[in-house]
Amino acid sequence: MTQSQYRPGPDANGLFGSFGGRYVAETLMPLVLDLAREYEAAKADPKFLEELAYFQRDYIGRPNPLYFAERLTEHCGGAKIFFKREELNHTGAHKVNNCIGQVLLAKRMGKKRLIAETGAGMHGVATATVAARFGLPCVIYMGATDIERQQANVFRMKLLGAEIVPVTAGTGTLKDAMNEALRDWVTNVDDTFYLIGTVAGPHPYPAMVRDFQSIIGKETRAQLQEKEGRLPDSLIACVGGGSNAMGLFHEFLEDESVKIIGVEAGGHGVNTGKHAASLNGGVPGVLHGNRTYLLQDDDGQITDAHSISAGLDYPGIGPEHAYLHEVKRVEYVSITDDEALDAFHATCRLEGIIPALETSHALAEAIKRAPNLPKDHLMVICLSGRGDKDMQTVMNHMAAQEKQA
């Protein structure tokens, strides 16, 4: 495969192969075209890049460590496992990498109001954080179901000055929150910047979010070179929309010796229908401004996604992931709720790190694979977020298990 096949752009129409694009209402088309122009100009502006680097270093706290997970490695008895510690960022996840980039772009474009959608609440918190830092009003759309299971993050957003709009339509989760945010954007096109949290949405969002997250992979390459003197043998990251994964993967797509694994949320199992594994259990379609793999019924209606992790509970996936799946550069697998919970507990007890439930899906896949790999195999997992937000979910699950016992 050539570079152009693995890293195809996107092209001028926002397409990665047949995925991506700009499927938006007529009222939004001038806005997304303007955003694409502004983003291209910003990328070429040394002042913008200098300001971005300043905030990455002094506000987010980058670079974060590449940590050798010694006890987990011993426990698995195979591959040498490293964690890219995105949970050590300010706000506790990878989301802020993207939010800082987009808020600087909003400021450059003269926008006076931020809106965002959130599932687990981490993107909402990161958006509220940068809104506070830059003195901008901020409205966060969040599904009512997610508000119930992410009370701590809802409170954090309010503390930071954000207005939370509960979304009761549909299943009251991330898909529905994104629908409402898009409606707001159509209504308030002049002064509002829509800060999308993942590598989805109409072009230029998938490429722009990937670019702001690609610092994860760039740092990983340099840090592993320093520690081990070579490339990783495998990369593993969880995939909902897929921004933490794209941030880690993109840097290594041309390095064919590096095996790349994306981990979807298998829920109760892909064969049960109660999951959020768009690539393993979906078909191509159009949602939220782009063509990608989606969970759909026989009539083409979007079906409900399920995952114990609110951040993976989305019935689609970023279009670049769909492309990488089709060209077979990245292997996409699924992990069930129970497997993710087991990995969550193992990481807590072996490494003294409480990972997010999203991240626990990647950890579960690593724990499955590592024992069958040689001891000199270098495996990097994106530790995309910390698990403070998931305490209630885990407590509820443990209480339910005790009742059954």
UniProtKB/Swiss-Prot annotation:
InterPro entries: Trp_synth_b_CS, Trp_synth_beta, Trp_synth_beta/beta-like, TrpB-like_PALP, TrpB-like_PALP_sf. The modification N6-(pyridoxal phosphate)lysine is found at residue 95. It comes from the Bacteria. Keywords: Amino-acid biosynthesis, Aromatic amino acid biosynthesis, Lyase, Pyridoxal phosphate, Tryptophan biosynthesis. Its EC number is 4.2.1.20. GO terms for molecular function: tryptophan synthase activity. It catalyses: (1S,2R)-1-C-(indol-3-yl)glycerol 3-phosphate + L-serine = D-glyceraldehyde 3-phosphate + L-tryptophan + H2O. Its cofactor is pyridoxal 5'-phosphate. One of its GO terms (cellular component) is cytoplasm. Gene3D superfamilies: 3.40.50.1100. Pfam families: PALP (PF00291). Pathway: Amino-acid biosynthesis; L-tryptophan biosynthesis; L-tryptophan from chorismate: step 5/5. The keyword Lyase applies. PANTHER family: TRYPTOPHAN SYNTHASE, TRYPTOPHAN SYNTHASE-RELATED. NCBIfam families: trpB. Belongs to the TrpB family. The beta subunit is responsible for the synthesis of L-tryptophan from indole and L-serine. Tetramer of two alpha and two beta chains. HAMAP family: Trp_synth_beta. This is Tryptophan synthase beta chain. The gene is trpB.
